[in-house]
């Protein structure tokens, strides 16, 4: 809780204490044993948080790691995460679907143009997204898209992904 009379420093201190209390020893050990820094894990978790309604975080995490770490051209992704939520972070007044012009936006948060992670988290992720970033599913997925059923559909290859996107099941 925040009270009248609390300043920004009080609020920040409370947020930090809350974060530290939730990032327990087990989670911190997982971070230390990973090849990613705490900031990178939280950045990945923030991408997961903004990309899903909470039903498929571990699969979204798998796609992110596969694109970051995959071999060769990473199934045609070349290390580009191509995450809409990060682009929308760079375009806070954007409405409607993302266009090809939007994908040309000059911003470090445009993961259609910049390989790897954005420079900072794009949101404050919940524990479920942090846990997914620490424990992604082991898959060969490199792509996902939202279906008309409201669920993400995952693909291993660009051909599979394009077939889904061009089907009547694609939800945009």
Task: Give the label of every model feature segment.
Residues 1-172:
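Bacterial extracytoplasmic/cell-wall-associated proteins, especially those involved in peptidoglycan
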